[in-house]
């Protein structure tokens, strides 16, 4: 098999080393917004194992104290790369601590907005950055400058809010330029990536299509076959279309009806993908197999792993059934994994812990016989939507709300049965139907109904009822890393609740989830 270049080897790349800040992913997003490719890895990344050389390195913020015994620290080999380095918040303190300066608790913690004063206008990091509002989030502070560094910026409470090495392109800032509250933060990040690191602004979806198609062809070769999971969602559809563009009929799209799909989903997917996009599609009804294995299981992590493992078994079986005309065996399994999936599943001792196994990157068998191919794993959601439109996929499909790989199984809290799935499925259908009628669908990033494992007393007619509870969720987000709940009008929620209680047998009560991410995740399980 020919060697396949990583995206970070094809495009000039800024490496973001994550120390656990809730804002770390925003650094990557901001850089990509001005067409510079950025990749985030844990701060524990060994530079010798990287396999590519970044144009520059950014050390993120984090919740630790650099002087603590259990504090995470960057691989010192990063300083041997000979590339510019920018430390943000904890990253500044890490740079100073490594250089021998004293870092300790501040007299008072500094959270929220502050006024930045640029002290060194000649510093290239602050080119076209004036005194402005910045966002602070720290309890520790630098007590003295490290040797060979000078001050570039200050705030009222931070005399070393910006520092720079006297002769090397090493910079530190105590504030967070990646958040929108820092009014000129994007300019500062662009100065670092484009002016200081000299990273080419070539990261566009047009360029990505050409690069990724070539990568797929190199990876798969001229004869191998690929089998791909599709669900009718944005991610799997874009991945399937991209694969079809790359290898044509050697790609076999498979829809597994796992018994926990949306209402009429199998028929709709067959029409849209098969007839509309010309993708060769096979529908496999494995609903009984999935539901049987889920019987009696209530733990959400176990559900995910069961669904992931069963999914792989079904695909291996289907791959064996399909006989390619050229006699080659199917070698690859396509998945529509996105970059947020990868970020959320990173787990290392210290700054970050896995919140839950992601349905696209977790729950896979160790002995999986098919090789995984994930052409979208470097992309955020908005990038995937843009890519889909460039590939000729309809606006309606490209902007369809996400649907999780485990489907309604993680929207039925508790044991998953055919009856419980049907209740959640019907409630969800009514909810989405009303959102569309109200003209709100494209204003909302994701919406769904889930069935709670509790019962509630109700009154239907003159009869007392004791039935289940539906929770509705709708969120607004740009990247699914953070999200706010959608503020529906009360009359809208009243109407939806009335329809669900009256039309879905077994439901006595409807609630609306008003929790943001963080602290909650988008899905309940």
From Swiss-Prot:
CDD domains membership: GATase1_GMP_Synthase, GMP_synthase_C
Cofactor: Mg(2+)
Magnesium is among the record's keywords: yes
GO biological process: GMP biosynthetic process
Short name of any one Pfam family annotated for the protein: NAD_synthase
Binding annotation for ATP: 231-237
PANTHER family associated with the record: GMP SYNTHASE [GLUTAMINE-HYDROLYZING], GMP SYNTHASE-RELATED
Protein name: GMP synthase [glutamine-hydrolyzing]
Organism: Eremothecium gossypii (strain ATCC 10895 / CBS 109.51 / FGSC 9923 / NRRL Y-1056)
């Amino acid at each position: 098999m020919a060697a396949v270049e990583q995206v970070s080897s094809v495009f000039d790349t800024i490496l973001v080393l994550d120390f656990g800040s809730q804002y770390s992913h925003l650094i990557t997003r901001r850089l990509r917004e001005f067409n510079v490719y950025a990749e985030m890895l844990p701060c524990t990344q060994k530079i010798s194992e990287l396999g590519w050389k970044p144009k520059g390195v950014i050390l993120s913020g984090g919740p630790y104290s650099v002087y603590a015994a259990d504090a995470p620290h960057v691989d010192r080999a990063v300083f041997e790369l000979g590339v510019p380095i920018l430390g943000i918040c904890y990253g500044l303190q890490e740079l100073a601590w490594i250089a021998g300066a004293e870092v300790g608790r501040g007299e008072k913690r500094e959270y929220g907005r502050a006024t930045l004063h640029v002290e060194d206008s000649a510093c290239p990091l602050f080119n076209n950055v004036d005194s402005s509002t910045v966002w602070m989030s720290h309890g520790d502070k630098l007590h003295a400058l490290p040797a060979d560094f000078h001050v570039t910026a200050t705030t009222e409470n931070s005399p070393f809010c910006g520092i720079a090495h006297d002769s090397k392109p090493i910079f530190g800032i105590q504030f967070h330029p990646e958040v929108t509250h820092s009014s000129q933060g994007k300019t500062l990040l662009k100065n670092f990536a484009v002016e200081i690191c000299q990273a080419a602004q070539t990261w566009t979806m047009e360029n990505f299509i050409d690069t990724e198609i070539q990568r797929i062809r190199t990876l798969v070769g001229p004869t191998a076959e690929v089998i791909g999971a599709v669900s009718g969602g944005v991610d799997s559809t874009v991945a399937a279309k991209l694969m079809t563009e790359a290898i044509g009929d050697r790609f076999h799209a498979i829809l597994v009806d796992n018994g926990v799909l949306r209402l009429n989903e199998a028929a709709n997917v067959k029409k849209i993908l098969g007839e509309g996009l010309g993708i060769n599609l096979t529908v496999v009804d494995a609903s009984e197999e999935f539901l049987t294995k889920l019987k009696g299981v209530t733990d959400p992590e176990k559900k995910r792993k069961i669904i992931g493992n069963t999914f792989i078994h079904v695909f291996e079986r289907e791959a064996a059934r399909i006989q390619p005309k050229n006699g080659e065996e199917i070698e690859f399994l396509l998945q529509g994994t996105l970059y947020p999936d990868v970020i959320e599943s990173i787990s290392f001792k210290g700054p970050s812990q896995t919140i839950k196994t992601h349905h696209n990157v977790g729950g896979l068998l160790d002995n999986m016989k098919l090789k995984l191919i994930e052409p979208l794993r470097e992309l955020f959601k908005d990038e995937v939507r843009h890519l889909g439109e460039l590939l000729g996929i309809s606006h309606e499909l490209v902007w369809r709300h996400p649907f999780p790989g485990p489907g309604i199984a993680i929207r039925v809290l508790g044991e998953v049965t055919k009856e419980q799935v049907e209740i959640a499925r019907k409630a969800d259908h009514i909810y989405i139907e009303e959102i569309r009628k109200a003209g709100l669908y494209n204003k909302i990033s994701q919406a769904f109904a889930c069935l709670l494992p509790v019962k509630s007393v109700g009154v239907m007619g003159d009869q007392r009822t004791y039935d289940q509870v539906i929770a509705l969720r709708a969120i607004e987000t740009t990247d699914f890393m953070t999200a706010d709940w959608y503020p529906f009008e009360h009359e809208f929620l009243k109407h939806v609740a009335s329809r669900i209680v009256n039309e879905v047998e077994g439901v006595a009560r409807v609630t609306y989830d008003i929790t943001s991410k963080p602290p909650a995740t988008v899905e309940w399980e």
